[in-house]
Amino acid sequence: MAEITAALVKELREKTDAPMMECKKALTEAEGDLARAEEILRVKLGNKASKAAARVTAEGLIGLYIAADGKQGAVIEVNCETDFVAKNTDFIDFINKLAELVATQNPADVAALSALPFGEGTVETTRTALVGKIGENISVRRFERIQTPNSLASYVHGGKIGVLVEFSGAEEVGKDLAMHIAATKPKALNADGVNAEDIAAERSVAEQKAAESGKPAEIVAKMVEGSVQKFLKEVTLLSQPFVKNDKQTIEQMLKEKGASITKFVLFVVGEGIEKKTADFASEVAAAAAGRA
């Protein structure tokens, strides 16, 4: 059997990005044949990725990119299973490069992004290799791109909340808007952009509360409408009190600064994803079963 040297293991690791021990095992199985060991790893990592794909990815990070000219930008959410992996440098680098790729290549959807050239392969082959290397499922959940003749601003809070803003005005206004949106999480610019289902749900709750008051129908109707309007003011950006000066709304602040906002994108990691929970006893049992 050929000697499995440290240099050989290092070379295979550099080619595949697989963990050191996996490289050594593959070389041993391949009797020192580098090409064969690479193929063995590809199969193993593929199997590992397939097993991981069934697991829930509710953690992750937001990636943001704005071109040097400030006219095109992108925000992307990539999910993983644990917060620990979300801090992995390879994972972070993957996300940042994806955000730039979205901005420059303008893919139609996640499937189109997955097929784009990336490194020595595609986005999808790189993702699969990263799953094998890290040992957790990784999924590209969503992205949005903005191309504008105006200006772009962005803000990321702890890697978990990402905002991209299209606006006209001073750079400081864009920064303030992005930070305000991250803090207050508005649903839309104005009432016209609020989802009809959200309004209907709020109206239903208001009707139930108002009906319990025992007041005349015309008063109940006014109470309901008042509650709905209050809700809309709370969730629409232009109506919200500015976080840096709550005596004026965002709309008033923009008017004062001679600025305007066209669009914003707000991503919150894991928003709407149901996290899998397990009690300690179940986790121990599952781990024991995995070793059996």
Swiss-Prot record:
Major localisation: cytoplasm
Keywords: Cytoplasm, Elongation factor, Protein biosynthesis
CC terms in the record's Gene Ontology section: cytoplasm
InterPro entries named among the record's database cross-references: EF-Ts_dimer_sf (IPR036402), Transl_elong_EFTs/EF1B (IPR001816), Transl_elong_EFTs/EF1B_dimer (IPR014039), Transl_elong_Ts_CS (IPR018101), UBA-like_sf (IPR009060)
Pfam families, per database record: EF_TS
GO terms, molecular function: translation elongation factor activity
Residue numbers spanned by region Involved in Mg(2+) ion dislocation from EF-Tu: 82-85
Thylakoid listed as a keyword: no
Keyword Cytoplasm: yes
Subcellular location as annotated: Cytoplasm
Entry-linked HAMAP family: EF_Ts (MF_00050)
Protein family according to the UniProt entry: Belongs to the EF-Ts family.
Role according to the record: Associates with the EF-Tu.GDP complex and induces the exchange of GDP to GTP. It remains bound to the aminoacyl-tRNA.EF-Tu.GTP complex up to the GTP hydrolysis stage on the ribosome.
Protein name according to UniProt: Elongation factor Ts
Gene: tsf
